[in-house]
Each structure stands twice: as C-alpha cells, then as structure tokens.
Amino acid sequence: MTPRKTVVPPRTALVIGAGMTGLATAWFLQEAGVEVTVVDRRQVAAGASWGNAGWLSPALAVPLPEPGALRLGLRTLLSPASPLYIPPRADPRLARFLLSFSRNCTPRRWQVAMSALAPLNRQALAAYDELARGGVAEPTRASYPCLIAFTTEAARQPFVHELEAVRAAGQSVDYDLLSGAEARDQEPALSERTGAAVRLHGQRFLNPGAYVAALADAVRERGGKVVEGLRVTRVQDHGSEVAVVGSDGTDVRADVAVLANGAWLNRLAAPFGVRAAVQSGRGYSFTLPAEGLPTGPTYFAAQRVVCTPLGADRVRVAGMMEFTAPDRPADPRRVQAVVDAARPMLPGADFSRRSDEWAGPRPCTADGLPLVGPTRSPRVHVCGGHGMWGIALGPLSGKLLAESIVTGRSAAELTPLHPLR
C-alpha cells in the first residue's frame, strides 16, 4: 500500500454515475460504513453498462491500443463497415486522442500497460464473489464452453500469441486449441467457415443490465440513495465538503465525491487536474432468439463480434468500436455491420428478428488503462476509463478505490492508474 496524508474517513459520499463502476464503488464504500448517494444523468445502467456483451473474461482484458490497430489503414478506419470506425468530421479533441492512442500502439507500451492490468485481472472475479456474498442477487455464470472462433489456424495465431503475452505479464491463462471440427462439435451453431478455435477456461459472464440493476438494489437495501435523471453540471470543492450541482439547480453535498460518469468524465474531472482524455468508444448490440445461436459465450475475433446467452431463450450479439462523441445518435449502419460480420459465421441465426438494438459509449483512454484514484482535491476521486473492461474490472476498481478513500492508503495496483498521470 502507498501511504497518503492521514485522512479522517468520510461519513458521506456522492457517486456520479450509476453504471457498474459507480455502483460498485458505492457498495464497497457502504461496506466501510459510509453513507452514499448515487446520481445519474439518466438511469441505472444507462451508459455503457446495459447492452454490452457481459463477459467477465480476465484472459481477454488487454490494453485497447495494440500494435495491430495501426495496420488497419485510414481507408478502413473511415468505413462504417469496419470493426474500428472513426466517423469523418472535424473534431480537434478526437484528433488529439487518436494521436496519443497511436503513440501507445507499440509492443513496448502494450507490455507496460498489460503489466499494470495483470494484477487487476487476477483479482477481478474475487470481487464479484464478494458482492455475491454481500447480497447482490443476480448471479454470474461460468463460461463453458467459451470459444474464440477463427476461419483458419493462421488467423488464430496472433490471438494465441496475445494470450501468451498475457501469461508472460504474470496472469494465469488456461486454454485449449481446437480444430474447426472440434469447435463445431462443441458448438453446433458455428458454420463450416470455422476452421480453428481457442477454448478458454476459468471465465464467466453475466446479463449486464440485470446485474447492474441488482447492484443498485443492493445499494438501496443498505440505505443508500440512487437518484436518476439528475444531470450534474459541476462539482465544487468547498474545503470541508463537496457540492454536486445539477442542471436544475439541485445542490447535493457530501464529504467526498466519486466521478464515475463514464465517457462524460472529463467534463467534471478536468477542473481537478485530470488531463488524461476519456474518449467514447461506442459499441453496438442487439438481441436475438436463441435458436441457431451459440449456447455458450462465443467470440469471432476477426469480425469483432461476441455472442452472449441471456437466459435460455435469448442471445445478445455485440461488437464494433466507434470513436465518436458520446451523445451522437446511433448509426444504423453499425448495427448492419455487426449483422454482416456475424451472418457468415452463424448460418442458423435469424437476424431479421432483432430486438433491443443498443449503442453504448465505452469510456476509453489513450494508454488503455483506467483512471482510478484521487484528483488534485483530496475530496474528489475518479473511477472510470475502463474501455471494454468496465464490467469485468468495475467491481475490483470500486473496491480498491473505496479502500483508498476510507483509509487514505492506495493499493499498489492503483499506482499506474492514477488519474493525474
């Protein structure tokens, strides 16, 4: 643990953002006896939490900026059919983010970021177990089979190389290599185009919307307040307390505040010295009837498409990454891009029966590491920027941040995640 100036534990806390990271932070603050109020501009799980794939897969939680991202080329990045899409428009802030992102797409920087993520990944599932023991009612489920499907063995090789790099960073990764026939025996929904696969062990998944709602219920049951529909315009540090001011003039006060408002984090965090940009990396999803779809979590790596069972009769199909403003309207071409990418791999699926089409702004950082810890003010803290891994790493991040707030000591795992880096 890294010592900080001795602090008096707060009695009250305001958490801005009712997604996974915000609610997990609130829950773990309650564990320490802190009275919490959570506020959200819309509602529980309204940002990046509700419609994502729901994978709790530490083996796959790697830095988003990777060397392969630079090989896509400008023409591909500007195509709405591409897995990674950048809508062409004048946006100086996005341009600065992309420049910084590209500088982190090197093997050395990827290894540095992976070394920071590995200790978090090792503890991620244990944080979920703690929430379950504490009364969060929605379960997590074992991912078996958890398949990563490819068209050829050659296409699989870079993914296997990445798994070995994750292992080299100090993280346990357990997997088997399957032939196409073995993968199709395991998961009959896969098409003949599946020529190779990786079967991961020790992973989990959940229904993210249901889980985050259950986490909000658990916070309420412990006496916490969850205020929906309050758009926070600014946070003020008054020395002895923090004030959260809403667009309607609401003024809510507490001893400390936690900024966990996802892709909108910079608007509130910048006055407290947080310079690292948090960029919306929007993902898309929809739900299909389960017939003709995988029975277990399945990822088509080249297509960047994920399938996740939601109970016995529905499957979520999710994918894509789109760097754009978080409040921009969803682009229907991106939903079609998911359909077009998935259809050849899943011949039995009826994509005309889509429901619950969704777009969510995942909060991404240029170096691929979240922002978790104190700001320039000892009363204002940050928990965000997890990119694609907010569901997997949100509970652990909330636990470590809550411990830091209450004790004044930060765990070593938080050092590379410092919001003022």
Q: Which role fits each region the language model picked out?
A:
Residues 31-51:
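Glycine-rich FAD pyrophosphate-binding loop
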Residues 177-182, 186, 204, 225-242:
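A conserved short coil-to-beta-strand element within the FAD-binding core of flavoproteins
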